[in-house]
């Protein structure tokens, strides 16, 4: 069977798949699997805020994509018993956009801003007073007739999510009273998440099949659930409708996702560094140009997992692949070094 290069991270969900995605999201801390330390701390912070009848301190959630930042934000609102509004940094283009969202919040509501590192500087400055003093100052008119009007806001909790916390300005970061980092999930927890999702989707899934999918899910629940949906398709068309180990392996191989969870782009990154740059070191921008990919996407989406799993490392001079990458790709590290010294 011809392999399909399926980039699970860039796959665009249909509206129906988005409904499935929402149906799979836990709605309470009790149902949320993984991130034990983060969840335990949030339980305490949320309970304390409820006992005081106050808005929860502003929360910053950071970590790689797909680890549950949006889900946790929704759970925070559910546990507080307040409203939940969602927006993102790129959408808030002007101060007026931010003002419209902030003035619509009821007391103690949760406002979730995804990709908060992508806020424009002018919008970010308006956010400072909103976070600290629950007010914003809006300029009316222009020129000599311009004047500032102060608008009081209801107390609220801002939950900011970012995959690139290093891009946050120091003043914005300092205004978050709660700062939490999300880690990759281990395979056992991912396997439990997959079995829970399979139950919600009403598709039988064996323990071993769930473990097989989990092992190729890059420690990421979003990827695990996306792979589950695709394996379910294969089970319905090529199998009996149930997901067992055999159909799971068949589907994942057809999707060109290897036993480490690496997909076509991951392997292209490693091959490019080896074949074109003799294993590195090489700069990120150079890698991106050679691949025709965005440097930010490589740094944010692909690189963290490759480094975590030991296929790549960062050095002061650039990115280098490791001996494990050579073994994984069936390449000879000695041959590469020999070529380097012969140049």
UniProtKB/Swiss-Prot annotation:
Q: Which GO terms describe its cellular component?
A: cytoplasm; Holliday junction resolvase complex
What molecular functions are annotated in GO for this chain?
Answer: ATP binding; ATP hydrolysis activity; four-way junction DNA binding; four-way junction helicase activity
Q: Which GO terms describe its biological process?
A: DNA recombination; DNA repair
The record's annotation in InterPro entries points to: AAA+_ATPase, AAA_lid_4, DNA_helicase_Holl-junc_RuvB, P-loop_NTPase, RuvB-like_N, RuvB_C, WH-like_DNA-bd_sf, WH_DNA-bd_sf
Instruction: State where Mg(2+) binds.
Output: 70
Q: What is its EC number?
A: 3.6.4.-
Task: Report the locations given in the UniProt record.
Answer: Cytoplasm
Keyword DNA-binding present in the record's keywords: the answer is yes
Give me the ranges of the annotated region Head domain (RuvB-H): 259-343
Q: Which residues bind ATP?
A: 24-25, 66, 69-71, 132-134, 175, 185, 222
What Gene3D superfamilies does this protein's entry cite?
Answer: 1.10.8.60, P-loop containing nucleotide triphosphate hydrolases (3.40.50.300), Winged helix-like DNA-binding domain superfamily/Winged helix DNA-binding domain (1.10.10.10)
Notes on the domains: Has 3 domains, the large (RuvB-L) and small ATPase (RuvB-S) domains and the C-terminal head (RuvB-H) domain. The head domain binds DNA, while the ATPase domains jointly bind ATP, ADP or are empty depending on the state of the subunit in the translocation cycle. During a single DNA translocation step the structure of each domain remains the same, but their relative positions change.
**UniProt function note:** The RuvA-RuvB-RuvC complex processes Holliday junction (HJ) DNA during genetic recombination and DNA repair, while the RuvA-RuvB complex plays an important role in the rescue of blocked DNA replication forks via replication fork reversal (RFR). RuvA specifically binds to HJ cruciform DNA, conferring on it an open structure. The RuvB hexamer acts as an ATP-dependent pump, pulling dsDNA into and through the RuvAB complex. RuvB forms 2 homohexamers on either side of HJ DNA bound by 1 or 2 RuvA tetramers; 4 subunits per hexamer contact DNA at a time.
This chain's protein is named: Holliday junction branch migration complex subunit RuvB
| Gene that encodes the chain | ruvB
